[in-house]
Structures are given as structure tokens and as C-alpha cells.
Amino acid sequence: MTAYTTVQCPELDPDSLAPSIPLIVSNFTLGIGRVFSGFIADAFGPINSLFFSFFAGGILQLAFWSNATTYGSIIAFGALYQLLGGWFFALLPYAAAQLFGTRGLATITGYIIAGQSPGQFAGASLSGVVLDGTGSYQKVAYYSGSLMLAGSLCILPARFLREKRILARL
């Protein structure tokens, strides 16, 4: 986020703290979002909340990050994205327990994390390839947001196999 801020806001002194402020704000709101996610999961269900987080994160990347070109909008994007889109690790064990039960939960959670590790390892590199190939952070936002939306859609089959009612707390 600091590199993006430096590119989008060349008027900021790169040796000052200013380009890092969006990262600091986003990390602060990530903590708030993870705590908040527990309350949301209690109210609406962990699987529904996990879907919402992924979906909101994808939409924020596609609609907001792709157009965040001012210092204020970059800070706002970072804050909103982490507040709403960063619930994965907080909700993963809770959602896994809802889907598979608590027996062997540590193993199940480990397999889920291992299953998403290729994306974690390759995601930043692929974003770099997109950035190098296009020279546009907007294209990176489209790529990243699209993958996050696709990830949110991958949650739906498991959710609806467990409970078909749309408004069910699951």
C-alpha cells in the first residue's frame, strides 16, 4: 500500500511517514474489523459473515481501489477494505466448525489454510506480473477484486448444501 500511495501521490515526500499512513490506518482497522466480525458472525452466522467479507472485499477492490487515486481515497479504501474484507482468519475456524463439526477442527482448519496457500504465495507475484505487463494498478485491482469475488462464490455451495434457506443464520 505504501508503494501504491507513493505512485499515486508523488507530491508526498517518500522519505516521510506520509506514504505509510494508509498502511497504518488499514492495519488499525483490520484489528477493529476482526473483532467486529465475531459479533457479526454471532448475529448472522459465520458462513454468511465469511461470504459477506469476501464479497465486500472484492467489490471494494473493483469499485473503490481501482479509482482510489488521491491520498484521502487511498486511506479510505485501506480502512474500509480491512474493516470489511479482512475477516478470513478470524472466521475460518468458526465457519469450519459450523460446516464440519468440532471433531478434528484443528486438522480441518489446517487443510483449509494449506488449500489456500498457493494463492497466498502466488498472489503478490501474479499481481506484480499484471502491474509490469500493464503498468496499471487499476488492472491489478480488477484482477485481485475479481479473484476475491470468485472466492466468495466458492463459499456459497458449501453454505447452501448445509442450509437451503437464504436468511438462515449459518
Label each region the model flagged.
Residues 1-16:
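Short amphipathic helix-loop junctions that connect adjacent transmembrane helices
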Residues 3, 35-42, 94, 124-132, ...:
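Small-residue-mediated transmembrane helix hinge/kink sites in multi-pass secondary transporters
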Residues 13, 18-30, 34-99, 103, ...:
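C-terminal transmembrane helical hairpin of 12-TM major facilitator-type secondary transporters
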Residues 27, 31, 116-117, 121, ...:
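Residue-level signal for discrete positions within transmembrane alpha-helices
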Residues 59-67, 84, 134, 151, ...:
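Helix-loop junctions at the membrane-solvent interface of multi-pass transporters
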Residues 69-73, 132, 136, 160-167:
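Transmembrane helix-loop junctions in multipass membrane proteins, especially transporters and channels
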Residues 85, 99-137, 141-144:
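A late C-terminal transmembrane helix in Major Facilitator Superfamily
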Residues 142-170:
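Multi-pass alpha-helical transporter architecture, strongest
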